[in-house]
Amino acid sequence: MLEVARLHKLNGDSALKAFADVVISGQMLVKGVRVVEGKDGLFVSMPQNQGKDGKWHEIVSLLDDELKQALQEAVLEAFNA
C-alpha cells in the first residue's frame, strides 16, 4: 500500500532531519514529506506551503487515520534503516 520511493537525510543540527517521497497504493506520489525532530522525538510532517497570512498549510492531507499511521511508520522505518 505504501512505499518510500526516496529518502534524503540532512546533516546538521536543524530540527528537519529528512525529506521523503512516498507512493500510495501505486497510484499517487507525495513529494516533500518531512521527518522532523520535535520535543517528543521524531515525527512525520506532510508537505506544506506558507500562505499570504504567514501560516503554514498542508498541500496534501490524509483523511484516513490508518493511512496516516501507516505513512508515519513507513517513513520513520526508512529513516531509521
Sequence positions of predicted segments:
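Single-stranded nucleic acid-binding surfaces, predominantly the OB-fold ssDNA-binding core
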Residues: 1-81
